[in-house]
A protein has these predicted regions:
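Short glycine/proline-enriched turns and hinge-like loops at secondary-structure junctions
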Residues: 67-68, 134-136, 160-164
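N-terminal glycine-rich flavin-associated loop
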Residues: 86-106
């Protein structure tokens, strides 16, 4: 295994960064986070038609580019750096991975080409009002047989759930947790955008009342699919987190060079030096964890479950600590609404809690390695 990125992967990073610098500057982030939908449809269309980003790891047979999870991780790292406001994570990471892991060729052929082109926005709705990612907490009922069902219940904290054109929903049948595809505008579905701390990542409450749904995969095998998907999801999130962590480290170091106090740059003071050095150590360690997770995901090897939990736990804390220290190094200006430091701090906190916080993943890691 080679930890160095290939020339092609570095070129991908360069291209994506240039695109995001142009399309997702701080002004665009602030503009989109104030809107209900939370993203610019024109930029989304360019991401699909010009860049092909939505199909980055989707197999070519389903209209994608057929790259590996490493390339997806490179893209997500750059998106984390720029705080991109778009339904990319929900569509490409949550929904596409669920379809790919479902084993349902018909569903893949039906939905993946639209996702790869950017025509379809999608998401995964699994968490219920308890807020826990847990099989035992899934109580939504599915009634029906064959491939046609109706769903009733509530899903919470659904990423981009208020705008997704297709929603994958977990629900209980007589055979156990199963997965279903629901049209975003289906009759009986009520979608409510939630007010969240992190305005750059939209979430929604979805209420189902006898909503028509189509079975995805094998009835009763939904949690097996979701368990595999969660490992892939947290690895992807770790990649996004290290992008944000590197950005706040860069912000802190740059400010320490130009902010003068007592006749000298504050970066020359030992206390600031130590803060920056500690941030660097954590960020570089987080990158190692995230990159190894990306490689494990691309290989789908037996290490993936353990490495996924390890990377999510470590990268969550590294990003949150770096974002908090960035505010401290900036001093008073770092606490203001006008400065971008708080945007990264809020993203760091929301990402820390998504799909299991560090405590959850440490416990899961302990179980997975047999402690």
């Amino acid at each position: 295994m080679n930890f160095a990125f290939t020339e092609e992967q570095e070129e991908l990073r360069k291209t994506v960064r240039a695109f995001l610098d142009a399309k997702s500057p701080e002004t665009a982030v602030r503009e989109q986070m104030e809107t209900v939908n939370g993203f610019d449809p024109a930029v989304w269309a360019q991401m699909g038609s010009q860049m092909g980003l939505m199909g980055i790891h989707i197999p070519e047979e389903f209209g994608g580019m057929g790259f590996t999870y490493i390339e997806l991780g490179v893209v997500l790292e750059e998106m984390g750096r720029s705080l991109l406001c778009a339904p990319f994570f929900s569509t490409v990471v949550l929904a596409a991975n669920t379809l790919l892991q479902s084993g349902d060729d018909a569903a893949k052929k039906k939905y993946l080409p639209g996702i790869a082109s950017g025509e379809t926005t999608a998401t995964l709705a699994s968490v219920e009002p308890s807020g826990k990612w847990d099989e035992a907490r899934i109580t939504m009922k599915a009634k029906g047989s064959g491939s046609s069902f109706t769903l009733s219940g509530t899903k919470m904290f659904v990423l981009d759930g208020h705008t997704a054109s297709m929603i994958i929903v977990s629900a209980l049948t007589s055979k156990g947790v199963s997965l279903f595809a629901v049209d975003g505008n289906a009759k009986g579905l009520t979608r409510t955008a939630l007010s969240t701390m992190d305005q750059t990542r939209k979430q929604a409450k979805l209420e189902f009342s006898d909503v028509a749904a189509t079975l995805i995969g094998t009835e009763g095998k939904g949690w097996d699919v979701l368990s595999r998907v969660n490992d892939l999801v947290v690895v992807a999130l770790a990649a996004e987190q290290v992008g944000g962590a590197q950005k706040v480290l860069d912000m802190a170091v740059e400010y320490a060079k130009v902010r003068v106090q007592f006749g000298r740059p504050i970066g020359s003071f030992q206390a600031i030096k130590h803060k920056c050095a500690d941030m660097l150590l954590e960020v570089e360690s987080a990158k190692s964890a995230a990159y190894y997770g990306m490689w494990c995901a691309s290989e789908m090897n037996e290490e993936l479950p353990s490495v996924a939990s390890l990377s999510k736990a470590y990268c969550s804390e590294a990003y949150f600590h770096a974002a908090a220290e960035n505010i401290q190094i900036h001093g008073g200006i770092g606490f203001t609404w006008e400065h971008p430091a708080h945007l990264y701090f809020k993203r760091a906190k929301s990402s820390e809690l998504l799909f299991g916080d560090p405590t959850y993943h440490r416990e899961l890691l302990a179980q997975r390695i047999g402690i």
